Amino acid sequence: MNRGMKPINELISPDTKHYSFTEPFQTELGATLPSVEVAYRTWGTLNEARDNVILICHALTGSADADQWWGGLFGEGCGFDATRDFIICSNVLGSCYGTTGPLSPNPATGRHYGPDFPLITIRDMVHVERHLLRHLGIERVKLVVGASLGGMQVLEWGALYPEVALALMPMGISGRHSAWCIAQSEAQRQAIMADALWKDGWYEEDAPPARGLGAARMMAMCTYRSFRNFEEKFGRQRQEDGTFKAVSYMHHQGGRLVERFDANTYITLTRAMDMHDLGRGRSGYEEAVCAMTQPVEILSIDSDVLYPKSEQQELACLLPNSKILYLDEPYGHDAFLIDVERVSRMVRDFLQAISRKG
């Protein structure tokens, strides 16, 4: 297993921009962050009317570099067309790709936050994104789009800022995190904490809990794909050294994440995902979802074992102005990252439909 995360400048684009809050930020649960810095990327040009904005929300281990992890959606005539639209993607609060999170310095102690970084919610992430848009002079977003953790943000954008988020496209997600997903995340967190190098979250920069984080990623990958996908891709095939190809793939994925992600960050963000519930603190789940009247297209993945299509169907039944689209692929939850041609077409078609309605 690799020893740890590469330097941040090797992991994010040199085109990354940064915005620093001028005042402290109070989280939904009452903690105060004295300062917040947001890393973000933009593509295209903001038009004179400032109404050609698309906001992309990234998933758990993603970054603001949407043109890298969702590159197949970028290009003229594609879902994200920088000749037509002004496209924004920011790294979420609590992450490790330039936005304030556990790796950031804590002004109160002079060292990084580590496990002292406060418990945050999806709503906190969205509020931070709203701050960024205000800084950019943007008051309307014609489409907010994202999958998984990104899809949670999309839905909260619709609930928190309906006057800004004019249309929504959540993918591979539910309106509230299920017990199944919460249990999966807790098992992954416990794998990290079981590593001898965890040290209650105060691990050394050059000696992180790499085995634990790698194991957590392996566990997650089993839920990001599907039975059929693993059988078709690996079956019982072996490498030349006799190792099952499925085993080799797991170790490869675990090692790759260790090189580019932080353990405290993984715990922070998965806990935020566990808090996801559109009805929490509102008038109730059904009432909160029914109150979202924007045009919504929900992308459901037939083979998703994390967020089964019954959850997207429930959302579609409650959202008054929604439509559900299906990716009938064997790839599992990660299909939104794999079948980019179809996903791009779906995004493009939704944008055209929004434009026609005016």
From Swiss-Prot:
Protein's cellular compartments: Cytoplasm
Catalyzed reactions per annotation: L-homoserine + acetyl-CoA = O-acetyl-L-homoserine + CoA
Major subcellular location class: cytoplasm
GO MF entries: homoserine O-acetyltransferase activity
GO biological process, one term: homoserine metabolic process
EC code: 2.3.1.31
Role noted for this protein: Transfers an acetyl group from acetyl-CoA to L-homoserine, forming acetyl-L-homoserine.
Protein name: Homoserine O-acetyltransferase
Gene: metXA
